[in-house]
Amino acid sequence: MLGARYLNFYVRSAGQRLLKDDGTANLTSEAALSGIKYWTDLYKSVSPEGSLDYAVLDQATLFYQGKTAFDFNSGFHISGVATNRSDPVDSIAAAPLPRMKASDPVNYPAEVSNVPLVVWEASEVKREAKAFLEFLFTKDKYIEFLHSVPGGMLPTLNDISQESSYASNETIKKYSDSIKVIQDQVSVGSAIGMEKGPLVQAGVLTSQGLIEKMYHSIIIDGTDLETAAKDCEKKLNEAFKAAGASIK
């Protein structure tokens, strides 16, 4: 889903989304086409051979190993670098997402991945499930969990972030500025395609690989960029309908 993620970052920085207001795909607007061209040109200019098929972990591993100086990712990179190649660990930091213009807001909505914890209404063990969730968020246990990967695991509870027993962790103190950058983005971001609420289209955008195939078509097959974008937009809309999406 790297192709979808990177294109999403670009169009979000331009104030747009990968979905139009009517629920159809947005790959042929001026901002989307500009983003496709930007990432295509960047790939051709600086990417290593074979990287066209990289997944999220492949790109992250290059950063862990000190083979690339940049990645769109989270605070888990702190432990990843420390484990794989410790020499650059004092030189890494999180920065706000790139902006179109210096005058644009530093922190704009882009992307957040959420893992919900729920107690199902139809569950036969609702009481036990609720008790388990309450146990997980017991202050001491929750802080212990957050400290298992400090800087990567970030508190969802505001009062925990103010707890001295949480904030006193050496890694958290060392990377406090970077952690704040990440938390600021988390507070305004949403899942790709869910900027206006849960939509079936969101899963299609990130799981079907259609945007990634579009990049293949442009880079490997030499397809004209606008032609490839129109074809991808058409295929995405067909996939949305097949998945039962509501299109206005």
Residue ranges of model-derived segments:
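Extracytoplasmic/periplasmic solute-binding protein
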Residues: 1-25, 31, 68
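C-terminal lobe and pocket-closing loops
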Residues: 77-88, 100-209, 247
